UniProtKB/Swiss-Prot annotation:
Gene designation: rplM
Function description: This protein is one of the early assembly proteins of the 50S ribosomal subunit, although it is not seen to bind rRNA by itself. It is important during the early stages of 50S assembly.
UniProt record, GO biological process: negative regulation of translation; translation
Organism: Wolbachia pipientis subsp. Culex pipiens (strain wPip)
InterPro entries reported for this sequence: Ribosomal_uL13, Ribosomal_uL13_bac-type, Ribosomal_uL13_sf
Subunit structure: Part of the 50S ribosomal subunit.
Name of the protein: Large ribosomal subunit protein uL13
Amino acid sequence: MKTFFLKEKQVDKKWLVIDAEGLVVGRLAAFVAALLRGKHKPEYTPHMDCGDNVIIVNAEKVHFTGKKLKDKIYYRHTGYSGGLKKTTPDNILNGKFPERVIKMAVKRMLDDGPMARRRFENLYVYSGSEHKHQGQQPEKIDFASLNRKNKK
């Protein structure tokens, strides 16, 4: 029996939409990262971009468990000496771009490298309930009903 290798033409990418209102950030990010990689498909191939396109709406209404909203710290560096910057999820969610919390969580759950960067481009996060991908007829996924711990 020969090993099956997926070809570029055989990839069937679907469009999925997830409403993030009231969902726990870490659980949502892990689920979305698996969808972007295509791990839920039987024809999953590690060296191919066989994952789906994922749209997340209501990104500003996500929840953190415990005291992570105030205590968790995101670090970044400007590249200059003494340029270490810190921020919390609370500052980001109340700021100008609240969708960055979900984007950072999903990006950090993907592996590093060019394939992960290509997969990450298939993620679309919006802070409101509207999105501009109605033409693709996305399929709605009720992530909250999959496990009682997914919703807070």
